[in-house]
Amino acid sequence: MLSTALRSSSLTIHSFKLKPISYSYHSSHHPLWSGLQTWRDSSLNHNRFWGPSGPQPEPPIDPDSQVGSVTSLAEMGAMVLSTSDPLTKSRLSHLAYSRWRKEKLSVGVSQPPHRPARPPKPQLVSPKDIPAPKNSGLPLNAYMLHNLAHVELNAIDLAWDTVVRFSPYSELLGDMFFADFARVADDESRHFAWCSQRLAELGFSYGDMPAHNLLWRECEKSSDDVVARLAVIPLVQEARGLDAGPRLVQKLIGFGDKRTSNVVAKIAEEEVAHVAVGVYWFVSVCQQMGRAPCPTFRDLLKEYNVEVKGPFNYSAREEAGLPRDWYDPLKESKEDEERLSKVHDRLAHIISMEKENSNLNREE
């Protein structure tokens, strides 16, 4: 629950009520992604089909009777989480977000399932048991695309779980928090639709090879902690997409699959917004708690045993507003060395001056 947002802090539900989250965000140390407000204000994105030249609108989707029967964002999110078929989950996600935007429904309150519903395939195994490309039965481009589809499907559930799980605290967090993560869920559902379409064009489908459940296990770690959820999911898991995206694009180009590389490049471009949303809300909640974001982020990673691995795409992370000193120990070590070097230089200068003064005194 929100009252355990940071176990080492003095945050309580009552103190949070006295100081509701402010939407102002001014800090020279944490510059926002320049496109955040444009992303928030943009109209519904119906470009869920990948055409000859890129994303384009798909044929109109008939409204789902289930989505039409509920009256709040949280209830619709719980419905998406309880849907096992991946393509249906993707479609319902878009319908739910569209209805909430068009009808201006309330956030409401609901409870998420213990785990999101999943199809019989793919088989979920330990990450070490994921077959190598040559043993997967898929060509390299389909192998990489299947892995990305799995990430995007999990990302749909991760975003909706954040909406639903913390819906009892909508008065504390504010509607914008839920609007942001519902939009993230809609983006992820579009990304999965593109991956699924491209897999079908290659003659494969999601579920044709095993996948891991690592992403959801990371989500479960933060099920009672909104600050940890923000740290672990957008600032670690989503940020890994910024690192991996350009490398994946280059591998696909090298394989000769330009169309799939274009899909992946567009997904990587849109993931910047998701990391930026995480940074915005993580810093906002930390400010509300009177905690410095950088040490708080590091403390949470240690507490929840979350490892941040490189290589890092520093430029994309910086664009999203994620400061390098939060996650890169090498930067901190380098800064320490530079500080020590400056101290050493100052001491050497002082010693040199003392020697000169001593020599002058002797000459006198």
Regions found by a protein language model. Give the residues of each.
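Non-heme di-metal
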Residues: 2-364
